[in-house]
């Protein structure tokens, strides 16, 4: 699938006119004069179908709501700016009228971050798209935030021989702004880094409509990094209106390898030693016994490790040699590289999510980052915790991203609720998430590696960050005193009232 537009997660079980809101929040109706002023600034729409479409993302729980003729919360109006000036004017107008704003791009997030909890204005950023300029000497790309992954990469590769190297599972249906807002990671991150490492600078519209540039230099020491402040802020501190990304020459060569280990711990040790020796292949993915059997050639007792690197031949040879040495030293057997080919061909497939949801199963994923010394404990503890929940049918994991000091563990779980009612589904979903996230935090993992917080994880963030969350909340209040930017997210208390769910 290659698209350059948002892709709906799942169909509704009823006509759009019959859809109701799951979240019940109180907001004042938008006045006719406000809507008229908005339409003067840029194209806007309060068409019902438009409002429903732009108020969704890929949060798995919300898919069950869709199958029960509900959406999370509809926006009141959709705006489609095409310039920074448009965004600035929209924000200033909303600030003066205390109207909440939620930014929308590809709407591929899985935690509900793009859902407008308090209605108001949704700004559709997908008309603000395209590569503006490329500094080929420095490898610096100026791009608009509504640009979809395929459009960015195709432009850079075909016209400039460059690649950003950011390939998340949502690559085909997500945008540059979304990558930054959620602090995402691509599947080649062990070589190229997370989106944090790729962003050189940002243009940001603040909550009063003013516009700032955070800088585009390769490094700096003029106080804390303002660029970093907005990466991962999920549209709650400012609206990203322009981006400068670091790009690399297209890799001239590629190499692949696959291994099977008799134990997850042996494979983790091989990965750790390879990474700490300086080997950073673009892809280094380890699957536990269950996931290896399901999709990667294992027999139920083996763990598959898939390796792919790209770049100059001399560098690839060195990287792959280090990885091979550590794998063999830790009791691995070499496998057919066709396993890597299979993964490459199916890595972005999400069809199982929709299929199982339609059958009434609860299915979701949870990713956390953890130091090497705790990887095995976190992996085992979280899976065991999930399986203690009533109705849990499967808990598995893989390591998807690696660093000098640790890795990302990506869990997948499936549960069968006690009945196919929405109430039973929600009880099952919440129970598994509580078990999984709390056990991860208990054993030393963080809250999230790259999916972000949104609505789903908001209840855990204060525990995860501790007093540091108060600092984050103080920044939010300083930048957005009227609480208009994506209110109710990142665990921030909203001045707009209580968030209730329809029963």
Predicted regions and their residues:
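Activity-critical C-terminal alpha-helical subdomain
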Residues: 210, 454-503
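FAD-binding subdomain of flavoenzyme oxidoreductases
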Residues: 130-285, 484-485, 500-503
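Short, ordered loop/turn segments at secondary-structure junctions
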Residues: 105-108, 169, 286-289, 452
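N-terminal flexible segment immediately upstream of the FAD-binding catalytic core
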Residues: 1-92, 109-138, 289-298, 339-363, ...
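Alpha-helix capping/hinge segments and adjacent helical runs
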Residues: 40, 44, 48, 441-453, ...
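C-terminal substrate-recognition/cap domain of FAD-linked oxidoreductases
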Residues: 8-9, 46-65, 249, 255-263, ...
């Amino acid at each position: 699938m290659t698209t350059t537009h948002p892709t709906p997660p799942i169909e509704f079980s009823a006509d759009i006119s019959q859809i109701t809101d799951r979240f019940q929040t109180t907001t004042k109706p938008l006045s006719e004069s406000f809507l008229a002023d908005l339409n003067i600034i840029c194209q806007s729409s309060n068409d019902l179908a438009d409002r429903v479409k732009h108020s969704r993302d890929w949060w798995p729980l919300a898919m069950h709501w869709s199958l029960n003729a509900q959406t999370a919360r509809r926006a009141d109006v959709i705006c489609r700016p095409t310039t920074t000036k448009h965004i600035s004017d929209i924000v200033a107008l909303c600030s003066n009228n205390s109207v909440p704003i939620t930014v929308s791009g590809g709407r591929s997030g899985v935690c509900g971050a793009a859902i407008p909890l308090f209605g108001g204005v949704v700004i559709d950023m997908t008309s603000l798209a395209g590569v503006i300029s490329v500094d080929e000497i420095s490898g610096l790309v100026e791009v608009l935030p509504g640009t979809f992954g395929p459009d960015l990469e195709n432009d850079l590769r075909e016209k400039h021989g460059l690649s950003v190297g950011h390939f998340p599972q949502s690559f085909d249906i997500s945008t540059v702004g979304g990558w930054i807002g959620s602090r995402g990671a691509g599947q080649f991150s062990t070589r190229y880094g997370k989106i944090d490492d790729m962003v050189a600078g940002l243009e940001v519209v603040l909550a009063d409509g003013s516009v700032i540039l955070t800088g585009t230099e390769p490094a700096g020491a003029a106080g804390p990094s303002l660029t970093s402040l907005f990466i991962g802020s999920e549209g709650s501190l400012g609206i990203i209106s322009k981006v400068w990304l670091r790009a690399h020459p297209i890799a001239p060569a590629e190499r692949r390898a696959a291994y099977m280990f008799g134990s997850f711990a042996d494979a983790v040790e091989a990965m750790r030693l390879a990474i700490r020796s300086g080997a950073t292949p673009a892809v280094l993915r380890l699957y536990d016994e269950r996931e290896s059997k399901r999709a990667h050639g294992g027999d139920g007792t083996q763990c598959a490790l898939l390796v792919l690197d790209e770049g100059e031949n001399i560098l690839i040879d060195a990287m792959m040699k280090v990885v091979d040495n550590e794998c063999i030293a830790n009791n691995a057997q070499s496998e057919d590289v066709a396993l890597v080919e299979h993964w490459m061909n199916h890595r972005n497939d999400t069809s199982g999510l929709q299929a199982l949801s339609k059958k009434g199963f609860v299915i979701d994923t949870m990713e956390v980052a953890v130091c090497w010394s705790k990887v095995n404990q976190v992996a085992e503890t979280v899976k065991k915790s999930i399986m203690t929940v009533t109705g849990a049918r499967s808990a598995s994991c893989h390591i998807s991203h690696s660093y000098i000091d640790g890795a990302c563990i990506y869990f997948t779980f499936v549960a069968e609720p006690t009945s196919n009612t929405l109430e039973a589904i929600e009880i099952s979903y919440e129970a598994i998430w509580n078990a999984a996230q709390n056990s991860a935090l208990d054993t030393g993992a963080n809250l999230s590696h790259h999916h972000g917080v949104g609505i789903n994880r908001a209840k855990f963030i204060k525990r995860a960050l501790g007093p540091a969350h108060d600092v984050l909340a103080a920044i939010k209040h300083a930048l957005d005193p009227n609480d208009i930017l994506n209110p109710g997210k990142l665990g921030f208390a909203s001045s707009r009232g209580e968030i209730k769910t329809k029963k």
